[in-house]
Amino acid sequence: MSAQLPIIVVGAGTAGCTVVSHLANNTDHPILVLEPGGYGNDDDPQFLNLSDTDLLRTSDDGYVQARAMGGGSAVNGLLLTGDEPEHLHGLTRYAHAQDIGSVGEALLALGGRFSRLWWNGGRWNPGRAVRHLMEENRVSWLPRSVTELLLDGDRVIGVDCNEEPLRAAAVVLCAGAIASPGILLASGAQKLNPMIGVGVQNHPTITAQFSLGAHLPARFDTAVVREWSTSAGGQMLNVGYERVAKNLDGVGALSVSLMNPISRGRVEISSNHMPHADFQYLAADEDLFNMVEGVRDLIRLLVDGKFTDDPESITVEGRPLVDVSAWDDDDMREWLRRSVRGVSHAASSCAQAVDSAGRVLGLDNCWIADASVLTHVPTETPAASVTMEALRIARNIGESLS
């Protein structure tokens, strides 16, 4: 690396790889990416084959986050429920009948549709481009986790990796909507910017499981979705899963998620500086109402659909379907408050902590370019929104440092 200080990009997930690729191709600055994760298999269409690898990390409170070059795009379920980003045209495709199994077929019969997939001859993973840049010596990589920022007053001058200081010309946080604010909080930056970590969201989700019996394997673990709206305007998403785990082909699943939640929480750090998110799922009455309606609809799908030949095998978050079906709305609300879960879609934890260019307010020389800065959790699977926002902020960074 030259004597010139590098731009340090913290995290090589979907956002980080997008930022690295743009800056490496559009600035003269050396680029150093810090990412503790390794590489996955971009040629395996069944994402659950990655579920027991070191490419995933589960926090003490159960939140699952990628730990891989390419981040969530290296390990996700491949669903792109929204539009294909213009700058990635041709790198995705729609699923078709040869891709799905019995669960997808049952959901199609109930109004589902084939989803667009982050797949076209292989998984779209922005980590591939970064890997090529590394092979060409245009980008440097260290397998490090950043613990905090190095500050000189309100100016960010580098990062600390477990007492290994690294100086930087600029720092771009792309560690995700929990880890990025966590790094800022561990650095004491909340004294300069009290909105760090405030407003985090996720998609509240309930999942049913059922026995599949004899069935043919599907090419993709999930490829069919169903979108609908509640009477109150809740945007709901059903996803069918052809299996629930790598070595559990005999069990399928059907989930329902609220895609436009109102409830917001915050990211905080523990006494040992580990970040965690309190999402405040269903804190807003509107969200609770929509999820009650969502579960009622899920029950109807499970009863009317041909998901299983063994109705007694159906459970909803571990409770027999017959029990859940019998509850009145009060019982359902009480159960939902205890049982609702999230998915790996954390967003918006720093939307109020940055300016329109992605600069962290109160700090000089520091940007955030990941899902943290989205104004709300996307109403579709989030990778498209994340990569578009990361590219926008990367362009801003490139212009400001040129």
Model segments located where?
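Acidic glycine-/aspartate-rich tracts in secreted/extracellular proteins
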Residues: 37-41, 152-153, 177-178, 189, ...
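Short hydrophobic beta-strand that contains or immediately precedes a catalytic carboxylate
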Residues: 33-34, 141, 368-369
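Conserved redox-cofactor binding core of oxidoreductases
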Residues: 77, 85-156, 162, 309-340, ...
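C-terminal lid/capping helical subdomain adjacent to the catalytic/cofactor pocket in oxidative enzymes
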Residues: 278-289, 297-402
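Redox-cofactor-proximal catalytic regions of oxidoreductases
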Residues: 44-109, 113, 123, 254-276
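N-terminal glycine-rich phosphate/pyrophosphate-binding loop and immediately adjacent elements
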Residues: 1-90, 191-224
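Mid-to-C-terminal "cap/lid" subdomains and adjacent gly/pro-rich loops that border
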Residues: 18, 170, 181-263, 289, ...
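Short hydrophobic core segments
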Residues: 8-10, 34, 146, 165-185
